[in-house]
Amino acid sequence: MKILMISNHLGVQSGVQRYVQNLLLHLDTAKYRVTLFVGQCPPDQASTAPALEAHGVEILAVPDNKKDRIRALAAHLRTHKDYDIIHYHTASKIGAPVCGMMRVLCPRAKIIVHSHIVYPPMTLTWRAAHLVYRLFADYFLGCGVAAGRFVFGDHIDDKPNFSVACNAVDAGRFHPDAAARAATRAAWGITDTDRLAGFVGRLNHQKNPLFLMEVFAAMAAQDPHWKLLLVGTGEM
């Protein structure tokens, strides 16, 4: 079976690309021939490409620019019409006509569109995009119900061809470690009487860190022993 996976870029700081990497590294690439069509890695980030290529994933890296990527995708599909599945990770309105383009150029493929975003406000253009996505795609995924509704329409979760695809974490990589815990708390001046709340993730709009600060302020007002540790970087 031949699969074309379409992601944003190869950088490790991309939440979408990390999801793609986790997914593909657990896929049997002897059974499923996977081509990853993706933007080039930003110069300030490490690339996910080495691990994916070592696992047998073919990577087609193109300029990390929307217009250039769309042109390159069209050119690729004109000469590669034998994909069984196209899995398209999307977070934009422009993805809707791109979905139509994929249907025209690769008519036998099953098209999966996968939403990773909730970014209000809802506009008339977005509502038009809902109709286009639903006209051309076969299956719909969202990292949550809200993400599915935002990109594909209010009632998409009522459809049998919609599913939530959770951004899974390998729990086996995490386990209690008393020595590491003590060292980390000492390094950050956290005493045995302090209570620690933690956040691990990107500091951007989607993760809603401002609301986290409001919640923490209420917790600290009730008990001054609370401290908040943020692990991550981002636009905010």
Segments and roles (model prediction):
Residues 88-96, 115:
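Short His-centered aromatic/hydrophobic patch
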Residues 137-175:
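A short, active-site helix/loop in glycosyltransferases that binds the activated sugar's phosphate group
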Residues 67-71, 110, 117-137, 149-156:
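Nucleotide-sugar donor phosphate/pyrophosphate-binding loop at the beta->alpha transition
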Residues 5-67, 161, 234:
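N-terminal strand-loop element at the rim of the active site
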